[in-house]
């Protein structure tokens, strides 16, 4: 391919709308698109390759949109997904919602029915804009072929600038014809650190703080602000906790790192945050689910003064009461706050050594607790352990499995986790040294997220090891994408926790419905065998001493032999805490025939 194929045409030119569409994507740095081929955009697809764009075909369009999400989160570029009008597009809705809640810049291109047939109920016709209106930052509908480049460019700009998905809706007949237009070039947005008044106020609060704590959120990752966060933390001697499911927002080897908040997060992080007199929430919206009580700790500091930094002003004070709100880029804001406190007399300097000792003590205690916490200790889990000791086969404790996986992870690894009980318990064990390493479905929490997302991440960073976690329930929704890995030489490693149940929801039946189990059991065939049938490697692990070596061998095969491996780990049916005790109540039955169901 000649290098000049990536050179965007300059000035007003005569071209087709398909050419305008493709040239605008080239101008925005697009090199990969995820999706399934379709007649609705075939004229444009025909010139993807000469433009230096690769269409990566998938098994299901939901997987394509998740791949675009993972690609964007690793690369820092805009992910792109495309599909056939109607059912191909509706298949993307769930994954675009996940990208929305992860603040991921993704452009979903939605070709639709031709203009002469709209409203007649034709083949694969649908009103596609309403499908995505809740989960996009911007929806562009091409109203005339001559405006193809304009709308395409605007969707990329909005996705990038507003940190979320944008929809580009194109009537399929608008790809054809002749137009005259100029290809718009992207204009990067300089967000800046925030207003001087709010930054001054933040610096004053931190100067007065005796026990400051920093919450490092997704904005630190997306804004490449880890070094600035680190410098500020070191100046303050402040413990740094990761916001929920942003475990890669601060290096785990740093002495001030204390682990994640949220479900199954770090007790050290929670105990230290509970004692804060000033909290700097850097690049986080302080989401409600990620700050719920956990481990019996209602840890949010009710009397602390809160400084919240977010690039989206709508997030400031939305969930938690704040003292100072800074609307700014996390990187620029952290650097500017550091500059302001440089040379100031800080109250926390007086107890820096004492606080450092406390931080280390809390971390040591939590690490020891995790080491000793080999299995769940609630009555149901103990019953399951006893029951399965009498069954054929060998079943491993999930917590021990997660600990062994943690120890075997390479430093440069990327990990995605699905929703579910074991996957969420993994929050205690996932530690990272660099940003853009950890991906989860965030507040959307959809099953089937992890595997396609890590495929997209691997496309963006083929030099990095890529590992996904899924339970056997969620795995059933996405395992068909093994064929995508094999067909298109995208090697990844998938860990499947085979405990034969929908664990997260079943835990609610344990705690609230007297162990009346409905639709929660999942007796499954061999996932390793299915993987082998699809052309990948498949390994069954049922001894704890084999967990780490199996992961290391699979990653070696991924990186050196370009092999995709599914590691099926046979786990007991023990279960961690329910996600939300506040979301359910003990049942009340008023009709006589249901009285026993309490």
Curated annotation (Swiss-Prot):
Alphabetized UniProt keyword annotations: Acyltransferase, Cytoplasm, Magnesium, Metal-binding, Thiamine pyrophosphate, Transferase
GO CC, one annotated term: acetolactate synthase complex
Family annotation (Pfam families): TPP_enzyme_C, TPP_enzyme_M, TPP_enzyme_N
Main location, first listed in the record: cytoplasm
Keyword Transferase recorded: yes
Cellular compartments annotated: Cytoplasm
Gene Ontology molecular function terms on file: acetolactate synthase activity; flavin adenine dinucleotide binding; magnesium ion binding; sulfoacetaldehyde acetyltransferase activity; thiamine pyrophosphate binding
Known partners and oligomeric status: Homotetramer.
Primary enzyme class: transferase
Gene encoding the protein: xsc
Protein name: Sulfoacetaldehyde acetyltransferase
Domain of life: Bacteria
GO terms of biological process kind: isoleucine biosynthetic process; L-valine biosynthetic process; taurine catabolic process
Temperature note: Optimum temperature is 30 degrees Celsius.
Cofactor(s), by name: Mg(2+); thiamine diphosphate
Catalytic reactions on record: acetyl phosphate + sulfite + H(+) = sulfoacetaldehyde + phosphate
Family as reported in the entry's similarity comment: Belongs to the TPP enzyme family.
EC number: 2.3.3.15
Keyword Ubl conjugation: no
Organism (species): Castellaniella defragrans
Pathway(s) of this molecule: Organosulfur degradation; taurine degradation via aerobic pathway; acetyl phosphate and sulfite from taurine: step 2/2
InterPro entries: DHS-like_NAD/FAD-binding_dom (IPR029035), Sulphoacetald_Actrfrase (IPR017820), THDP-binding (IPR029061), Thiamin_PyroP_enz_cen_dom (IPR012000), Thiamin_PyroP_enz_TPP-bd_dom (IPR012001), TPP_enz (IPR045229), TPP_enzyme_TPP-bd (IPR011766)
């Amino acid at each position: 391919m000649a290098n000049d194929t990536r050179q965007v045409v300059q000035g007003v030119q005569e071209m087709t709308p398909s050419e305008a569409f493709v040239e605008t994507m080239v101008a925005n740095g697009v090199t990969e698109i995820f999706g399934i081929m379709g007649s609705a955009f075939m004229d444009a697809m025909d010139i993807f390759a000469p433009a230096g764009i690769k269409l990566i075909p998938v098994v299901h369009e939901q997987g394509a949109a998740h791949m675009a999400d993972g690609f964007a989160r690793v690369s820092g570029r805009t992910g792109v997904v495309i599909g056939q009008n109607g059912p191909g597009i509706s298949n993307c809705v769930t994954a675009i919602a996940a990208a929305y809640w992860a603040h991921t810049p993704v452009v979903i291109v939605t070709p639709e029915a031709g203009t002469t047939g709209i409203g007649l109920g034709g083949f694969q016709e649908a009103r596609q804009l309403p499908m995505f209106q809740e989960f996009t930052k911007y929806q562009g509908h091409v109203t005339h072929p001559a405006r193809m480049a304009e709308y395409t460019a605007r969707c990329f700009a909005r996705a990038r600038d507003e940190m979320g998905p944008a929809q580009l809706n194109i009537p399929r007949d608008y790809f054809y014809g002749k137009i005259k237009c100029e290809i718009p070039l992207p204009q990067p947005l300089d967000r800046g650190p925030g207003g001087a008044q709010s930054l001054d106020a933040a610096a004053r609060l931190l100067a007065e703080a005796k026990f400051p704590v920093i919450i490092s959120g997704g904005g630190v990752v997306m804004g490449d602000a880890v070094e600035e966060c680190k410098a500020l933390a070191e100046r303050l001697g402040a413990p740094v906790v990761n916001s929920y499911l942003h475990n890669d927002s601060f290096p785990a080897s740093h002495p001030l790192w204390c682990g994640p908040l949220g479900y199954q997060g770090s007790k050290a992080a929670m105990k230290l945050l509970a004692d804060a007199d000033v909290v700097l929430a850097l690049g986080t919206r302080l989401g409600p689910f990620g700050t719920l009580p956990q481990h019996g700790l209602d840890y949010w500091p009710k009397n602390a003064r809160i400084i919240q930094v977010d690039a989206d002003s709508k997030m400031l004070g939305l969930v938690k009461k704040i003292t100072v709100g800074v609307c700014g880029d996390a990187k620029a804001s952290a650097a500017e706050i550091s500059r302001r406190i440089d040379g100031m007399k800080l109250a926390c300097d007086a107890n820096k050594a004492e606080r450092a000792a406390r931080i280390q003590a809390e971390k040591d205690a939590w690490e020891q607790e995790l080491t000793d916490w080999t299995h769940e200790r609630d009555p149901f889990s103990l019953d399951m352990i006893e029951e399965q000791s009498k069954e054929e086969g060998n079943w491993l404790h999930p917590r021990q499995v997660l600990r062994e996986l943690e120890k075997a992870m390479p430093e440069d690894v990327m990990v995605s986790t699905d929703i579910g009980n074991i996957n969420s318990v993994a929050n205690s064990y996932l530690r990272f040294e660099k940003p853009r390493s950890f991906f989860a479905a965030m507040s959307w929490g959809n099953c089937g997220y992890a595997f396609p997302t890590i495929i997209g991440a691997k496309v963006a960073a083929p030099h990095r090891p890529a590992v996904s976690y899924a339970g056997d329930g969620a795995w059933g929704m996405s395992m068909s994408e093994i064929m995508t890995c094999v067909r298109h030489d995208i090697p990844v490693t998938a860990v499947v926790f085979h405990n034969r149940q929908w664990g997260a929801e079943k835990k609610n039946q344990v705690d609230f419905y007297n162990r009346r189990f409905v639709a929660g059991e999942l007796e499954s065939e061999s996932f390793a065998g299915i993987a082998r049938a699809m052309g990948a490697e498949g390994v069954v692990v049922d001894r704890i001493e084999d967990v780490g070596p199996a992961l290391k061998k699979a990653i070696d095969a991924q990186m050196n032999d370009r092999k995709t491996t599914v590691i099926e780990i046979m786990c007991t049916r023990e279960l961690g805490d329910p996600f939300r005790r506040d979301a359910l109540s003990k049942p009340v039955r008023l009709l006589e025939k249901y009285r026993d169901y309490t």
